[in-house]
Amino acid sequence: MTYARYACRATRLRKFLTDNDKNWVTNESGQNWIVIRYAEVLLNKAEALAMEDWNKNSVEALQALNDVRGRVGLPARATANKDTFLEYVRHERIVELAGEGFRYWDLRRWRLAEDVINGQNVHGVKITKQGDNSFTYEQVDADGGYKRIFYDRYYHFAIPLTERSNNQLCLNNEGWN
């Protein structure tokens, strides 16, 4: 089905699913929804420790990051530099939490959304099955070629009119007047 410029083609992310967990006839899975994973907790901890006081917390922050990496056999990271460490954490979040809905909110929290999002197109993938049961993958525009825009004011939400009406001293966030 297609809605305006957006297409739904029944391709789904299979992260956390195995063939044994899937009922291929009814297209259902008994897999419970994962609300929070330990890897996310460790990455949150690593980032928070580094932001609080890198000089005091660097050993514990590195340990949290390396616990996530070590779980899948990746080599440990080492750095004496807070900025380099935070780049490591950001990259690890992209890889470890892919497809879980964190990226947009991470970009907002790090105040990188304007740099990363602005001017980008939303892409999809056209998957075509070949006669030999292999597949080809083609990147396609999913939004009619429109460029994404993230304004500085989007870092903060507008305060709802009902809340401001209830309290005349409550001012809206900057950019939402």
Give the location of each predicted region:
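Acidic/polar-rich alpha-helix caps and helix-coil junctions
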Residues: 1-177
